[in-house]
């Protein structure tokens, strides 16, 4: 509409004069319309958090290499990309029972929490132990009973053979007369021999008959030798004093009570020791012969050859000796044995769980490999990790972090421990940033409002006057956040900085617009105009400068909407909408408030309050500038040279983690994790290899293709900045012998494929290589290593035919940051040109001058360079931090928009005075004097509003708040009062120079504007 007024040959003043008529006649309706707009925005306002994003890398362009790699990993690989939650457990030694109890209890607590259904997997070192104990118990149980069966067979061969003969002999003797001669005993022996062997032969496996027949014959021969043919015996002597089992025991094993054994004693060990050539079999037969006994009364009972307890004890002891397991595991192996043969999965699982709960890292009978162990427990054993994987299609993990932390506290209490525990990882960072952003708002906004009320109240000498800007901009913020929700829902995700930056920008700029309008109203009232005329004249003359100022802000942030970097795009759109709403409110609702409340807004003061001391200062400043303009110009230039040198020579930091305060749990956990595991362990860089061939099947691997992938893994490992590599041929960080796959048994082949599986895609044609960087993933050194990896990929493709025909993509958090930086760097140049050209065009149309817009842009760039240099020096030398990489473009955009306000207010007032007939010098002096107080007040309001961002705990907001504070104070108190008048005094008529066509149009507009304003406002 303002442009329409220019097209029709009259200036913007005419448009605002007519707008003022609408406001005067419909002020109450305007109130109602804005209240309705606020009410309509409330439902969207309440949901705005749902469209806020807290990760910078989430704004990575979708067509970037890292974004494409990320999508491939999500689709093809069942592995974390650094987006998992992490529970970090710290202590002097996390291998003890305290960490064990907590980790096990935490697993159970998280799994049983219905609010955490989006957790797909929970993994810690005790999960590894649990799986290993389950497998160990199952395998050992099978081995134990296989060993027991063999032991029972050997015992039966050695002692069962003699036992059968002794029993047969006892039966025969018991059926004979009470007395027996030696000849009769010999007959008993022959009869027992005849009946025993068929029984023995029927029970001995055929493969052992050739071994046992000579052994039996030796036993029978020795049995006969144990009797004296000339002696007389009775049944008592044969069956009780020298019982058959005792006689057989002496023959097989010997009599321990005799110092010298008869030659026919202890035949078992002698026979099997000399008859078996296989050393393993010989060892078993001799061990059984040594351990067991035939006779079970009473001293030999625990070692009775056919006793279950004896078999159990021997089997367990043999297993311990065979496997080299220490005696401390005797009870554990015994419990596995006691499951019985072929136990159910449930019983094995229950035992494994109990062993896990009751044992420790020190005592478990099975240990994971060092590579697997080191993924969960640090080298110094002071830090342990629990990894929480989230479902890809589940609720946002960020919303589960507080519940997880609550469960961590519950698990800590239930386990009876008091460990130092942190929940960190990408979702925790995002949650903590969200919480910190809310805390920042709760901390910053009240201070901002207080400062604005204080400054406006002091400026107007009123308690009521501050309520209009605060209420008006507060309403506009509510409406603007409703629009932000729509942007986040239908256009682009919204960066979390919008929550702080947009309200502050609106409070700063919007309040300036309100103050400028109210101040002009007070000036008109002081000149003797009534309320209606004052509202009309203030809007007519101040409206143009307000719109011009607001248009530069809207344009500056609007250019960011064209950025390829989503973070800048979302901030630009949000603040552009916010300032637009604030501008509309200032031009409609504030004049309506002036119409409704009038002079009562200045209670308890009055409209015409004098401020002689301020007038004197600005008059003196104008006089000083008139006398020393060259000195002012030279001073400004002398400051600009070193400031510019500092800006271009100092670097910036891309470290996302540095933005997160150390006081937050996620940052503290991250710091502990980095100390224990190294900076790149949890957020590795990965290379996706999309091959044209299949890499594996259920029982087959493509060794030729894997050789090329292994070459890529080894090449990556040799690169500076890479500390470890994982991949199909390095599944645990060390190479495996994949080339011998065909020589392995089915079980070993399955195990090898299973170990490779996390790094092989579901399509069977893709592979992933992880590179653990030795520097923090968000640091500049990590980005440098990332660029080297990408360069190495091209080299690999030139050296390997398979890789040359494959697609290789490098992704991960570092890659996302690098791609984001590349996109933002291109945006920086494009946006700088676009915003400066756009602002120049707006000022050219508004001021009808070519030089003055260029001069406005130059002076704001000077103040921006001074502020940037100051912030760099303060950040590096006092705060100990580098400048955040996104700060320069954000500061430029914000200050090209907001920083021009005061210059525009001054220049439009000078132009107004020139239009009314004053000379350039007189107009400059008068404008500086009349606008000094109001522009200073506006500058203090904006500086105060943005300075509250230094109360934030987020580094970027601290630096941005400090930079804007410096720029605004420089612009309002120095540039506008001293430098601008100095330049304009020297340029004289060039201040208003423009091409003839623009100059002629400007004269026509000014002439028509003056005539029509006289008609509209009256010639006062």
How would you name each of these model-derived features?
Residues 1-55, 163, 167-171, 177, ...:
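Membrane-embedded transmembrane helical bundles of large multi-pass transporters/channels
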């Amino acid at each position: 509409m303002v442009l329409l007024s220019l097209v029709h040959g009259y200036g913007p003043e005419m448009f605002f004069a007519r707008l003022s008529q609408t406001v005067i006649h419909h002020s109450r309706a305007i109130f109602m319309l804005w209240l309705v707009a606020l009410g309509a925005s409330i439902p969207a306002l309440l949901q705005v958090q749902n469209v806020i994003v807290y990760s910078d890398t989430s704004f990575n362009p979708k067509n970037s290499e890292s974004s494409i790699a990320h999508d491939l990993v999500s689709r093809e690989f069942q592995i974390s990309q650094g987006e998992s939650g992490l529970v970090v457990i710290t202590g002097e030694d996390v291998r003890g029972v305290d960490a064990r109890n907590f980790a096990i209890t935490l697993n159970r607590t998280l799994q049983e929490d219905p609010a955490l259904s989006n957790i797909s997997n929970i993994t810690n070192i005790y999960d590894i132990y649990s799986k290993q104990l389950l497998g160990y118990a199952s395998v050992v149980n099978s081995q134990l009973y296989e060993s027991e069966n063999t032991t029972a067979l050997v015992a039966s061969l050695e002692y069962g053979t003699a036992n059968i003969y002794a029993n047969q002999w006892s039966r025969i003797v018991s059926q004979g007369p009470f007395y027996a001669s030696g000849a009769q005993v010999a007959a008993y022996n022959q009869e027992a021999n005849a009946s025993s062997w068929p029984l023995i032969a029927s029970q001995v496996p055929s493969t052992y008959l050739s071994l046992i027949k000579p052994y039996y014959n030796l036993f029978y021969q020795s049995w006969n030798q144990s009797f004296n043919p000339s002696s007389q015996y009775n049944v008592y002597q044969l069956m009780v004093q020298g019982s058959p089992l005792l006689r057989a025991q002496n023959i097989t094993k010997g009599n321990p009570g005799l110092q010298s054994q008869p030659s026919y004693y202890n035949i078992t060990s002698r026979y099997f020791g000399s008859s078996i050539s296989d050393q393993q079999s010989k060892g078993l037969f001799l061990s059984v012969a040594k351990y067991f006994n035939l006779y079970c009364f009473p001293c030999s009972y625990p070692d009775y050859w056919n006793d279950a307890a004896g078999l159990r004890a021997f089997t367990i002891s043999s297993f311990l000796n065979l496997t080299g397991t220490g005696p401390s595991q005797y009870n554990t192996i015994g419990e596995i044995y006691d499951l019985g043969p072929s136990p159910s999965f449930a019983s094995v699982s229950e035992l494994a769980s109990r062993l896990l709960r009751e044992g420790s890292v020190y005592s478990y009978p099975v240990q994971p490999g060092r590579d697997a162990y080191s993924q969960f427990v640090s080298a110094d054993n002071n830090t342990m990790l629990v990894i929480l994987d989230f479902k890809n299609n589940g609720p946002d993990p960020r919303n589960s972090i507080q519940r997880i932390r609550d469960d961590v506290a519950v698990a800590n209490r239930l386990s009876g421990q008091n460990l130092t525990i942190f929940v960190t990882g990408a979702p925790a960072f995002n949650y903590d940033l969200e919480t910190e952003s809310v805390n920042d708002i709760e901390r910053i906004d009240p201070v901002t409002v207080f400062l604005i009320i204080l400054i406006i109240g002091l400026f107007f000498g009123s308690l009521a006057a501050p309520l209009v800007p605060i209420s008006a901009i507060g309403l506009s913020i509510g409406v603007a956040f409703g629009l932000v929700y729509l942007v986040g829902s239908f256009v682009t995700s919204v960066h979390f900085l919008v929550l702080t930056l947009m309200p502050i920008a609106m409070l700063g700029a919007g309040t300036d617009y309100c103050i400028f309008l109210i101040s002009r109203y007070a000036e008109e009232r002081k000149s003797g105009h009534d309320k209606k005329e004052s509202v009309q004249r203030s809007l007519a003359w101040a409206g143009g400068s307000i719109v011009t100022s607001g248009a530069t802000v809207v344009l500056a942030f609007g250019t960011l909407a064209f950025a390829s970097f989503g973070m800048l795009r979302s901030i630009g759109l949000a603040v552009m909408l916010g300032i637009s709403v604030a501008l509309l409110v200032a031009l409609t609702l504030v004049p309506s408030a002036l119409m409704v409340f009038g002079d009562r807004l200045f209670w308890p003061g009055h409209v015409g309050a004098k401020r002689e001391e301020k007038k004197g200062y600005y008059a003196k400043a104008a006089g000083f500038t008139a006398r020393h303009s060259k000195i002012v110009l030279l001073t400004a230039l002398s400051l600009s040279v070193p400031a510019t040198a500092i800006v271009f020579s100092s670097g910036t930091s891309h470290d996302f983690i540095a933005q997160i305060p150390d006081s937050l749990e996620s940052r503290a956990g991250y710091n502990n994790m980095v100390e224990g595991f190294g900076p790149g362990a949890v957020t590795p860089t990965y290379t996706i290899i999309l091959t044209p061939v299949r890499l594996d099947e259920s029982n087959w691997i493509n060794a030729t293709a894997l050789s090329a992938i292994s070459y890529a893994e080894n090449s990556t490992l040799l690169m500076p900045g890479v500390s470890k590599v994982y991949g199909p041929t390095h599944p645990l960080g060390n190479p495996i012998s994949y080339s011998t796959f065909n020589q392995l048994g089915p079980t070993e082949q399955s195990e090898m494929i299973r170990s490779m599986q996390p790094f092989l895609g579901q399509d069977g044609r893709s592979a992933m290589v992880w590179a653990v960087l030795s520097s923090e993933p968000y640091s500049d050194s990590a980005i440098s290593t990332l660029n080297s990896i990408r360069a190495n990929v091209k080299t690999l493709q030139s050296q390997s035919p398979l890789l040359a025909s494959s697609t290789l993509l490098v992704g991960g958090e570092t890659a996302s940051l690098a791609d984001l930086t590349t996109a933002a760097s291109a945006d920086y140049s494009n946006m700088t040109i676009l915003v400066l050209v756009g602002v120049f065009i707006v000022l050219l149309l508004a001021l009808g001058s070519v030089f003055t817009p260029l001069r406005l842009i130059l002076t704001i760039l000077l103040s921006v360079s001074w502020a940037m240099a100051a912030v760099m020096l303060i950040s590096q030398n006092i705060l100990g931090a580098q400048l955040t990489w996104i700060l320069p473009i954000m500061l430029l955009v914000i200050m090209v928009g907001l920083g021009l306000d005061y210059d525009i207010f001054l220049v439009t007032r000078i132009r107004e005075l020139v239009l009314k007939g004053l000379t350039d010098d007189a107009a400059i002096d008068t404008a500086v004097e009349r606008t000094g107080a109001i522009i200073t007040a506006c500058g203090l309001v904006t500086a105060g509003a943005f300075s509250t961002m230094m109360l934030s705990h987020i580094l970027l907001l601290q630096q941005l708040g400090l930079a804007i504070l410096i720029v605004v104070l420089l612009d309002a108190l120095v540039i506008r009062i001293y430098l601008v008048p100095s330049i304009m005094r020297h340029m004289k008529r060039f201040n208003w120079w423009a091409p003839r066509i623009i100059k002629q149009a400007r004269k026509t507009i000014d002439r028509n504007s003056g005539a029509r304003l006289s008609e509209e406002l009256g010639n006062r």
